[in-house]
Amino acid sequence: MDEETQNQALQDIFGPDGLHARFVRVPIDSCDYSLEEYQAVADPIADPDLATFSIDRDRKYVLPMLKKAIEISAEPISVLMSPWSPPYQWKTAPKIAKNDAAVYGAMGMPVPEEIPQRNHGGSLKPEYYGSWAKYVVKYLQAYLDEGIPVTML
């Protein structure tokens, strides 16, 4: 979306003559409706201390829009950080194959087999409960450090 269209959309949603939206939900890492799968640490097994944690992708795509929305809004905006799915390395295998029609429906867009199944099922393994908690806190702190008024998790 070009910058002019982005600005108009933000005005229509958050601006004084728009919808006056005051709530934004931001997924932690990719989610089912993301254009691609991504996570803030490439290999959390090799990096259990999360030393390589980075929200650079968010800085490029998410944070600029959030900051514009906050600037445009006449009222404070509440931001909900939504943990969607832990890194795939910490999860069990999904029960349904990611290209199965039960996942996306008969018209679902196929997901290439080489893409890990981060958002397509499976459960967090108990041995990673503490790691996932640290990951979420790290994400929350990174957004607070960027000046985003996260009020809910």
Residue locations for each model-derived region?
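N-terminal catalytic cores of secreted or lumenal carbohydrate-active enzymes
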Residues: 1-150
